[in-house]
Structures are given as C-alpha cells and as structure tokens.
Amino acid sequence: MSKAKCIMVQGTMSGAGKSLLCAALCRIFAQDGYRVAPFKSQNMALNSFVTRDGAEMGRAQVVQAQAAGVEPDVRMNPILLKPSSDVGSQVIVNGRARGQMSASDYFKMKRSLIPDILEAYNSLAAENDIIVIEGAGSPAEINLKADDIVNMGLAKLVDAPVLLAGDIDRGGVFAQLYGTVELLEADERARIKGLIINKFRGDVEILRPGLAMLEEKTHLPVVGVVPYLRVEIEDEDSLSDRLGTRPAVKPLDLAILRLPHVSNFTDFIPLEQHPLLGVRYVQSTRQLGTPDLVILPGTKNTMDDLRWLRQSGLEAAVLKLAAGGTPVLGVCGGYQMLGETLSDPHGEESGTPCTLQGLGLLPISTVFTPEKHLTQTKAVASAGSFAGAKLTGYEIHAGCTEVRGKAFCTLADGTPEGCVQGSVFGTYLHGLFDTGELTEKLTVFLCRAKGIDPAGASLIPMEQYRQQQFDLLADGVRAALDMDAVYAAMGLAAAKGECL
C-alpha cells in the first residue's frame, strides 16, 4: 500500500491562523477527490473532544476532520496537553490521560513519545492520500528546538514539505517571516516550499513591492495572500476574542462566566449564531449585570475556579439572580459547582485532599476520582420546557455525581443524566446545543419569560451551517493560494490520481 503525501503548515507565532489554513486545505483536497486526514503531533488546548471509541483529542483536529469529511480519530492528535495551572498540564497520549506533569518534567520526557507519534502518523498515512499536518507556535523558538516534536522536528521525522504562514493583521508580517526563516537551519529552510501572508485586509497591490523584497531576501516564493475571512468556524485561536466582554445587542442576554480555567467554550458557539441570543463572557459582578440566563461552563480545575467564583463575588451575584428567578445552566464543571458539596479525597483537582461547599442550587454531590469518564452520548431532554429535545454530545469528566432530584435528560440506554431544580439546570453533556433542538427550546423558554415573540427566529441545522462555512473557507483560501504550487510541493497534480 502506498504511503500518503503530506503538507505541513507552520506559523511565525501562535495565532497565525494555522488551524483554519489546515482546515481549508483539508476541505480543498477532499473537494478535489483525495482521501484526507489532519494531523498534529502535540496540541495544547483546553477544548477537547471524545471520539466514538472514548478517546480524548484536541478540537482543532476535530474541526479539520469535519472539513475533510471524515470522522475524528485520536490518531490525528496523539498528544494533547490540557493546562491545569500556569506551570503544569494533564498529559493525554493516544486519547488516555497519563497524569499531571510540570512543564519541565514534560520537556524532559517528550521525545520518548516519538514512537507514539510515528505509529499514529504512519497508520493514518497508510489509509489516506494526503495528510495535512499542523505545527504549533513557531519553528523558530530556538530554546525549544533541540527536543522539538511538533514543528521542524516532526517535519524531518515524516519528510514533510512546509508552508510558513504569517499574520499580517497583527502587523510586522515581513519581519515575522524573514526572521523565522533566518533562525532556521539550512536543512530546515530547504523544507519550506512557500510563504503565506494570512489575514490580509485591503488592496493586495499595495503589498506587491514588499512581497518581491521578501522573496528576494528569503529565496522563497510567496504562494498566497489570504484575506481576512469572516467565517463562523470553531477556532482555538479565537479563544481570547470570544471570551472578550461584548455587550448583548440581541433581544436575549446570555452571560457565560469566564472562569480562569474555562474549557470547551465551543459548547456555546451555536448560541452565538442565533439571531435572538446575545452571548457575553463575564468575569466580574459589574460585567454580569442582570442577564436573562447565566451559564457556568466547563473548567479544567473545578475546585480552583469555584474558589475564584467565591472570592470574586460572582457566586453571591449568581445566587441573588437565581433567587429572583433568573435561569442558571451549568455544564460539566459548572454543573458540579451548582451542587451542594464537591469532595476531592485524592487531591485530583486540588493537589491536596479537600471538600468545598458548592452553590447549593442543585441537590447533587460530587466526588472526584482518578478515573476520567469519556464517552459519546445521545439523550433526550426530559426537563420542563426542554422536554423532547434530542441531544448528541460527549462527556469528559473526572468525578461521580450523586443526584437527589429530577434529571435534566435521559440517555439512550435509559439512564437519567443531569439535574433540574426550578429554573436551575445542570448536565455533563458537552456539545448539547449542536443539534439545534435544545437551542430552539431554550430560546422559546427565555422569550416567553421576557415577553418576546420567538416566531421566525429558527436556524438552519448546525451541521448544514457548518458545512456551508467549510465551503466558504475553502473557496476563499483556494482563490488566494497558488494551489498548483501547493500540489507540486507534494508531488501531486490537482486532479486526483495524477503525479508530477
């Protein structure tokens, strides 16, 4: 069986747009008839996903797999680092947690994971025509180069040609690209087959003199100037933008608490796309105000974030709103916080054994355990105004929760899940709004409470919308890149089955 061709996208910095460029290439190659899979050897992210077989992987490669039209597979992201503090992360290898590690301890051992990386990559390469590889940060981090397993170090391992992207929207893109190239070794520079100017706004003709000078100084071609594309596609790099405080300019005001260790904020992207729902992320009582719904999202460190909630005054503010009838929703870690007690007998969350009082809004108690619960889930909401909504999601949590109240939903096997008390709702399900049914029922529920007519505000199905956005992304990138040069870098022609 022949091995797949590959192309790698590296960037001059974090946030250069590597993830979306890779998603675009996945879509383009799939449109051109190739079997495509994304790959990133090591991803650091708080947003993760559970595959069909219960393995945990980064959401960036999930999005890229969706763009390629294939099911997410943990082989696409064999190493996932989930930060739990400023100096440590949970290390997940092949979808399974290996435990917490400090940054220094991880750097000492990460090269031992090369066999896992190569096994995952080679397995994917045997099943596909093209592998689209995403780098991380910058290949010019000279203090990290010796043990690199995600940028040029990986490119050497799999013999990948590289496209280097710079973000012009932040300014200084010529210095970014030239400086990065100059800091690379000669054999690394030889791997770069083209430079990409990403996120450009304006008249490209103004750039022409700079592009010519950049090509002259680097001896590398600029293979595209990609415009700033306004597409609604989940992007790890958009975290800071999405978590920025924005006033609600839509009829309904939804306030999501910006927890210090917030995770899987992507759960709420479908809400942002609804014409009646204004979504804000807040981190103070002043910002909270009097919303129509308060949401406590997932978190990588429930105990620390509960302490922060208490110290910031947001706990008292949420309790006051709830007492006045404002609906409150908790997801995963946020659900645990809404309960009566949270016990960490082994120090899994806190580092040391402890028990904390929760907000007391739901009759539940949670005990954290070393084992992580990972599963894809189908359910039907059974609570009040949400009853009958079909849910498709996944669970990622360490802890067992005892529920002494009414369930939020019923799983496909008949098991009750989550909890409801009055206008307070909690669930472990991530992705609960993706099908659209719960979003519509939530919107009607909130509209009625506020005296707003919800008629005519329904959305197209989330999956249909997602596919439209992937096509828009691919169209924009295809028009901007010299795709003949990209295919030539891989030794392929644009039409499937042709080789150069």
Please state what every model-predicted region is.
Residues Y335-Q336, F433:
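Short active-site segment of divalent metal-dependent hydrolases/proteases
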Residues M1-K320, P327, D344-G347, P370-E371, ...:
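Flexible phosphate-sensing "switch/lid" loops adjacent to ATP/NTP-binding sites
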Residues E348-T375:
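Conserved P-loop NTPase catalytic core
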Residues G330, G334:
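Gly/Ala-rich beta-loop-alpha elbow adjacent to hydrolase catalytic centers
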Residues G339-G347, G351:
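Extracellular/periplasmic helix-exit of transmembrane alpha-helices
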